[in-house]
């Protein structure tokens, strides 16, 4: 009976597909945050005048287009930014 119950619990967890939560770095890379639902990308924003130091990091739903002043780099794995 215990085996049957354990099997049902495992099957339920697998079938529910509990979902995956993405973690993105904040501005300071040692700190990260869990992205809210619908925000499936991590991003880094750079000023075009200095592409070596990101000025903003976080979660986003759609990667913005680059402009003459700002460059965005987006990715979709944990802490990839």
From Swiss-Prot:
It holds the Pfam family Toxin_cobra-type. Its main location: secreted. Coiled coil: none annotated. Disulfide bonds join 24-42, 35-59, 63-74, 75-80. Keywords: Cardiotoxin, Cytolysis, Disulfide bond, Membrane, Secreted, Signal, Target cell membrane, Target membrane, Toxin. Expressed by the venom gland. GO terms for molecular function: toxin activity. The keyword Disulfide bond applies. Transmembrane segments: none annotated. It is found in: Secreted; Target cell membrane. InterPro entries: Cytotoxin_Cobra (IPR003572), Snake_3FTx (IPR003571), Snake_toxin-like_sf (IPR045860), Snake_toxin_con_site (IPR018354), Toxin_cobra-type (IPR054131). Residues 1-21 form the signal peptide. It comes from the Eukaryota. Monomer in solution; Homodimer and oligomer in the presence of negatively charged lipids forming a pore with a size ranging between 20 and 30 Angstroms. Belongs to the three-finger toxin family. Short-chain subfamily. Type IA cytotoxin sub-subfamily. Shows cytolytic activity on many different cells by forming pore in lipid membranes. In vivo, increases heart rate or kills the animal by cardiac arrest. In addition, it binds to heparin with high affinity, interacts with Kv channel-interacting protein 1 (KCNIP1) in a calcium-independent manner, and binds to integrin alpha-V/beta-3 (ITGAV/ITGB3) with moderate affinity. This is Cytotoxin 1c. It comes from Naja atra.
């Amino acid at each position: 009976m215990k085996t049957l119950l354990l099997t049902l619990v495992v099957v339920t967890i697998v079938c529910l597909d509990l979902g995956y939560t993405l973690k993105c770095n904040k501005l300071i890379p040692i700190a990260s945050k869990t992205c809210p639902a619908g925000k499936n990308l991590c991003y880094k924003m750079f000023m075009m005048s200095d592409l070596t130091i990101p000025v903003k990091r976080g979660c986003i739903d759609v990667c913005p287009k680059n402009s003459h002043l700002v460059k965005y780099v987006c990715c979709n794995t944990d802490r990839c930014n």
